[in-house]
C-alpha cells in the first residue's frame, strides 16, 4: 500500500494564471464570508460587494469596490467567544497615506467598519494600482479597518518596505486607530497565516485562517488533486 501524499500548503504559482485566478478570487471571497458570518456578534453583517458609496468631507459621494465588507447594525447585545489563536504579525510598516482623521456622515444602517480585499492583477498595475491606492487611503481616512490579502507575486505593492518586497505573498491589517499596518509575509511552500479581522471596539477580532480557507477552496474546486 502506498503512503498518502501530504497536501501542498500555501499558495501555488499556477493559481496566479489567468485561467485560474478569477475563480480563485471569487471563491475565496465566498469562503471568507461563510467562515466569518457565524463568528460575528449578531449586530454585524458581512456581504460581498460590487461597489461601495461613501460621503467625503464635502458631502460628495465616492464610489469604490471592496471585495467584502463588515457593517454594524443595531441589535441587542450578544455574547461572543472564539478559541482560534491568531498568529503574531511578521513585522509592521508605516501607513504611506498618513490619514487625517475627520468626522464622516454616515447612514445609521450603513456604518462601515471593515473591508477585506483580495488583490487582483488590476489592483497592482497601471491606473488600477493608482485607483486602488487612492481608494484605500480614502477608506483609511474615513476610519475603516483595512484588510488586504495579496496572493500575487507580480505587480506593485502600496506598502513601501524592503521586507514587503522580499515576500511572495503578503497580508496586511491596518486598523482604523493606527497609522501602522501589521504585515504577515509568506513565501512559496509556506502556509498562509491566520490573521485578525478587526471590528469596532470593544468587540473582539475575528480570527481568519487563510490557509484553511485556501485548502477548502482547493478541495471543493478539485484543484487540490491537479496541483499535487
Model-derived features with residue positions:
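Gly/Pro/Ser/Thr-rich low-complexity, intrinsically disordered segments predominantly at protein N-termini
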Residues: 1-228
